[in-house]
């Protein structure tokens, strides 16, 4: 894998630096590096394709080396270099496409395609010019079963959920109490609602508890807690739990109340947040949100009309908050919202009409992967995203 990365890195640097008018001595290092690459690859035959609609092709490498000059690079020199660049870029893309449609239930982080397996032989070790990227370091650590560290902005750690929990409801659902929740990507939105606005609760305080769990723990977490939950703060017709009828969720946001967010790791309480704003948590794999809705001692007639004593109720008082994970580190590879690598893999597998594999669901959906994230999926995803990043260098 590191050999393919080094080839792509060399091609990428050659493409950027070898331009008409450049002084040769300024690019001599990348020229010599390319020539060493060509000498190593020449005489080798590689095979790509054959899965799905990917065409089969044999690559018999026999490339000319780039010469030296005492002058600036002219158009003829650059054109010769472009021919080498185009050939190697096409070769890299074909290898990456072939690799991205393969998966293995065991040792999924190791190369699976014939070409990548061949490039792992000792003959090509001299090509290993550059393996300093974080992607290569993480892949190398994962393949040795060490603990790599991945850094993510807005990490996609929450499974998609858009539902509710009813704690109380009459036959017509005019008097309802419960939790409305929406989670996706890096966001968890909660609305604790009560049609009576805690009218009959002890001390006029109604308590709500929401439990959440991540499929993988995250660490060094920077998060934001803010009032409001825009995705659940709207009138919505919801089905009842038995799907026999529907009821109107018509929230009115209230400010009276308190909350506590407890963060746990392996069942042990790690940290606690009670205030809005920016917060940090060392590590967690589950969390519990406790909301206490407090009925105000006095209300204007307009507010009382929304929540009349004894009903009927056309609205629900809702205490809302949003938890957003801004930055975090993890020991597991995730779909990165700031990178196109995941979409490159998904699109390649779909465009190639890849047959259903043994590791991922057809279509490579992240939500289904995250909901049942296995070790085999993690290993394969590590390899696939690294290959996608290599392809991206020469696209």
Curated annotation (Swiss-Prot):
* GO cellular component term, pick one: viral intermediate capsid
Q: Which Gene3D superfamilies match?
A: 2.60.120.170, Viral capsid alpha domain (1.10.1350.10)
Which keywords appear in this protein's UniProt record, sorted alphabetically? Capsid protein, Intermediate capsid protein, Virion
Q: Which GO terms describe its biological process?
A: fusion of virus membrane with host plasma membrane
Entry keyword Protein biosynthesis: no
Q: Which GO terms describe its molecular function?
A: host cell surface receptor binding; structural molecule activity
The source's domain of life comes to: Viruses
**Pfam families recorded:** Rota_Capsid_VP6 (PF00980)
Q: Where in the cell is it found?
A: Virion
Q: Which SUPFAM superfamilies match?
A: A virus capsid protein alpha-helical domain, Viral protein domain
Q: Which InterPro entries match?
A: Capsid_hemagglutn, Rotavirus_A/C_VP6, Virus_capsid_a-hlx_vir
Share what the entry says about its subunit structure, partners included: Homotrimer. Interacts with the inner capsid protein VP2. Interacts with the outer capsid glycoprotein VP7.
Family in the record: Belongs to the rotavirus VP6 family.
Briefly, what is this protein's role?
A: Intermediate capsid protein that self assembles to form an icosahedral capsid with a T=13 symmetry, which consists of 230 trimers of VP6, with channels at each of its five-fold vertices. This capsid constitutes the middle concentric layer of the viral mature particle. The innermost VP2 capsid and the intermediate VP6 capsid remain intact following cell entry to protect the dsRNA from degradation and to prevent unfavorable antiviral responses in the host cell during all the replication cycle of the virus.
Question: This chain belongs to which protein, by name?
Answer: Intermediate capsid protein VP6
Q: Which organism is it from?
A: Rotavirus C (isolate RVC/Cow/Japan/Shintoku/1991/G2P[3]) (RV-C)
